[in-house]
Every structure is written in structure tokens, then in C-alpha cells.
């Protein structure tokens, strides 16, 4: 059954159960010149209710680095997804929508969709499927 296991920061209680997700899935973005972790999913929900999305703007890189933060053990895993097959565009003119969903407590899929950048750089409709398996 479901029961609380620990008092988190800011008075939140992390619920424990056979279907609960303990990882956030997120990306690191740069804001005001400083790297910042942006979670896409949150913890404390059943895997089948855990999903989220965020839009990012690619700079020079054609890859997205994902981080999986195990909040129960305070461990972080990383993975990189190369984005191939997009038309050549100047830096900061490619918007990617990242959608994350879990398929079990420790597995899921990340969809990366090319959203283009206005009329000058239209979306291609390309979708990259990036499955993940959490090891911690």
C-alpha cells in the first residue's frame, strides 16, 4: 500500500508505494549566464500519472542533455540525445518541445518535436523518440 516515507523540503511528504516515481526528469538550461536544472516531471505520483513537457531553444548544439534525479537516494544520472535530420538554422532559431512520460516505475519515453521558430524557420514535424531506463 501507499505510505509516507520522508518529510521533504518545504513540508512536502514523499509518498511510497509500488507504482510511485522517485525521479524527476529534467534538462539544464542557461539563464542569465548560469546553468539551471529545469525539471520536466515531478515526484510522488504513480508512474502512469507522471508526465510533463517543456519547450527549449537550441543554441549551437544539436543535442539535449537529460538528467534523472533520484530524490529518494539523491543520485543523478545523465543521458544525451543527439538531434539529427533538422535543417540548418542559425543558433537560437530552433525550438524543441520535450514531452516526457513513464511506461513503468523505472522506464519511460521522451519525445522531442521540432517546433521551428516562426515563419522564417517553419517546423519540420520531425519527432525523435528517446526511451530511457533508470538505473538508480
Name what the model sees in each region:
Residues 1-136:
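Acidic low-complexity intrinsically disordered segments
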Amino acid at each position: 500500500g501507499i505510505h509516507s516515507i520522508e518529510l521533504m523540503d518545504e513540508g512536502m511528504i514523499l509518498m511510497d508505494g509500488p507504482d510511485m516515481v522517485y525521479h524527476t526528469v529534467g534538462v539544464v538550461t542557461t539563464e542569465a549566464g548560469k546553468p539551471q536544472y529545469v525539471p520536466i516531471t515531478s515526484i510522488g505520483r504513480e508512474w502512469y500519472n507522471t508526465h510533463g513537457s517543456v519547450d527549449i531553444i537550441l543554441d549551437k548544439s544539436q543535442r539535449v542533455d537529460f538528467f534523472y534525479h533520484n530524490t529518494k537516494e539523491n543520485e543523478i544520472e545523465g543521458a544525451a540525445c543527439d538531434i539529427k535530420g533538422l535543417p540548418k538554422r542559425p543558433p537560437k532559431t530552433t525550438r524543441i518541445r520535450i514531452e516526457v512520460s513513464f511506461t513503468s516505475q523505472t522506464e519511460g519515453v521522451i519525445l522531442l518535436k521540432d517546433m521551428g521558430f516562426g515563419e522564417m524557420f517553419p517546423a519540420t514535424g520531425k519527432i525523435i523518440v528517446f526511451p530511457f531506463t533508470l538505473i538508480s
